[in-house]
Amino acid sequence: MALKDYAIEKEKVKKFLQEFYYENELGKKQFKYGTQLVHLAHREQVALYVDLDDIAEDDPELVDSICENAKRYSRLFGDVVQELLPEYKEKEVVNKDVLDVYIEHRLMMEQRSRDPGAVRNPQNQYPSELMRRFELYFRGPSSSKPRVIREVRADSVGKLLTVRGIVTRVSEVKPRMVVATYTCDQCGAETYQPIQSPTFMPLIMCPSQECQTNRSGGRLYLQTRGSKFVKFQEMKIQEHSDQVPVGNIPRSITVVLEGENTRIAQPGDHVSVTGIFLPVLRTGFQQMAQGLLSETYLEAHWIVKMTKSDDDVSGAGELSSEELKQIAEEDFYEKLAASIAPEIYGHEDVKKALLLLLVGGVDQSPQGMKIRGNIHICLMGDPGVAKSQLLSYIDRLAPRSQYTTGRGSSGVGLTAAVLRDSVSGELTLEGGALVLADQGVCCIDEFDKMAEADRTAIHEVMEQQTISIAKAGILTTLNARCSILAAANPAYGRYNPRRSLEQNVQLPAALLSRFDLLWLIQDRPDRDNDLRLAQHITYVHQHSRQPPAQFEPLDMKLMRRYIAMCHERQPTVPESLADYITAAYVEMRREARASKDATYTSARTLLAILRLSTALARLRMVDIVEKEDVNEAIRLMEMSKDSLLGEKGQTARTQRPADVIFATIRELVSRGRSVHFSEAEQRCISRGFTPAQFQAALDEYEELNVWQVNTSRTRITFV
């Protein structure tokens, strides 16, 4: 590769900044960087972002050179901008800061003491870092793909690259010294020391000509008002869980932020960072102990906070016609659900619920109050019913997920920990599992084994979707907009239907009510089911894959892409369904009161029905929730409640409408032998029965000669 002539490169840069333009809506030329240079000259703008896509239109070779040797070209661009600024300065700067006044005062004093026509002493020149009052950053070309953090190796040193990850730790913003200014106590001369490394050795002896000639040995004292500082922040980003090979620890990289790039991201944010990959330069005694190894960091130039759809690279792009044909079948809902953990036999309704958890409902924010759209599910059951297998599959399937166990998780491990920063010694926040799973799924196994003090940290996350921190003087709120999928075992080995739900699982009612679906998976002896399950397990062990089914399960990547497409939809509930949903909820409340239900049916149940309905509408890629979606949501809710009742409760819930109507009318005639027909009909309809069911019950018990109805049908009399 031929050596670059940087004088020619400098002319190219100058020409680009002066001449690059685009045509606006009126067809007039708009000089993009010329306008920004005017703002920089007048101090109306601090940072100049150079888009490499703009350079690629005229000179693709220059873009390659910048990407290969970004640090050198960053200084080159800075020098060119500094030279051009006086040409673009149209007026004097009104708002001057301390450094402006300091430099102007020094120049004025020096001019007074200098003879007329004399040339300024080059030793008194101010360093370019002190005079430069702007920041220059590159924005990477759109053609370059983001790298995985573990693929950033030694061959990337000095190059401009883009990495994606999740922010795990952010330090406080502090001032970093760029130029140190000293004053001599003997001759009064000023000395400037540009600082390039993280640490520096302050100057002690005055290097001026006067002190050296007189041998006065003047000592230098640091002038903080004349020194230049920039905002400095350090951030750690960790690679996403789907980028980590099985059995490996997630890699992380240190990102250094300066100036206008600070205070952009918080722990838990998913970011895309474009920057220069550099080694840490040690000086002084640290250089002697450094050895052959060097720490590295990314000098950030461009930071973008990403949404979930931006983050899922595989979700980008439309589905092909073949892929759409695979999904667009009549039973696509069943097919998608059965494609979740196909090696696990049965659990069809549980898999449907897990599919809806991945799709999620729609967030609502009426007048500032946030109603979550994420669906929470708790799987309970006897040991050996594949709860943990379902959790681990969802962890692999979800684009963003965190997997943890209750016994090995502390409260700070789930929410956020306050750690002391190794660089500055300051206290910093490091996000836990729930923060890192923001806009994803957090799978918590052995939920019942968690300590009570640690479990209380989840209450706020499940409803408010935030984590409030008040530790060691740090008061802040972090986002934790994640769905929680928990698995718990019964307290006494197996689920006892004679005990209440709280006694079986030993979880507080306040926490259980926050779950949209509580699913009990019991291991009941059944010859046919046991035979099919045993055949399924032996086949999986023999062939290391699931048995041949009636259909081919969908590929995991295809499911991820389809779920990402579903997230783009924002379905709404039409007014025509409002009364239907309300009546269904009232009926569920009535049934829960009549049958002494194991779970508490509250207003959260109604919100759960709405969330499940909107998730089903999203799954069908429509913008309006239909009655079938509501019915399926209610069916899943009923199935989850039925699973909690056990064999004893199954008969109680499946009581015939005629028998319930008979019991209702018998309550009305507790004082006498007859009751008004209209009163009985009104009472039964208010309890959710239809007039047809009421009439059928009347006819049935009249045939049995239990009661008689008079000819005018105004009175019911017991025989």
Curated annotation (Swiss-Prot):
Enzyme class: hydrolase
Keywords: Acetylation, ATP-binding, Cell cycle, Chromosome, DNA replication, DNA-binding, Glycoprotein, Helicase, Hydrolase, Isopeptide bond, Nucleotide-binding, Nucleus, Phosphoprotein, Ubl conjugation
Binding positions for ATP 1 per the UniProt entry: Y345, G384, A386, K387, S388, N489
Entry's Gene Ontology BP terms: cell population proliferation; cellular response to epidermal growth factor stimulus; cellular response to xenobiotic stimulus; DNA damage response; DNA replication; DNA replication initiation; premeiotic DNA replication
Broad class of where this protein is predominantly found: nucleus
Region (Interaction with RAD17): 521-564
Domain MCM: 332-538
E.C. no: 3.6.4.12
Residue numbers of N-acetylalanine PTMs: A2
SUPFAM superfamilies in the record: Nucleic acid-binding proteins (SSF50249), P-loop containing nucleoside triphosphate hydrolases (SSF52540)
Matches recorded under Pfam families: HTH_MCM7, MCM, MCM_lid, MCM_N, MCM_OB
Keyword Acetylation (UniProt): yes
Compartment list: Nucleus; Chromosome
GO molecular function, one term: ATP binding
Cross-link (Glycyl lysine isopeptide (Lys-Gly) (interchain with G-Cter in SUMO2)): K15, K28
PTMs per UniProt: O-glycosylated (O-GlcNAcylated), in a cell cycle-dependent manner.
Binding annotation for ATP 2: R514, R604
Record's keyword annotation contains Membrane: no
Chain ranges for the short sequence motif Arginine finger as given in the UniProt record: 513-516
Phosphoserine: residues carrying this PTM: S314, S365, S500, S678
Note: Early fractionation of eukaryotic MCM proteins yielded a variety of dimeric, trimeric and tetrameric complexes with unclear biological significance. Specifically a MCM467 subcomplex is shown to have in vitro helicase activity which is inhibited by the MCM2 subunit. The MCM2-7 hexamer is the proposed physiological active complex.
Protein's job: Acts as a component of the MCM2-7 complex (MCM complex) which is the replicative helicase essential for 'once per cell cycle' DNA replication initiation and elongation in eukaryotic cells. Core component of CDC45-MCM-GINS (CMG) helicase, the molecular machine that unwinds template DNA during replication, and around which the replisome is built.
Designated name of the protein: DNA replication licensing factor MCM7
Organism: Mus musculus (Mouse)
Gene: Mcm7
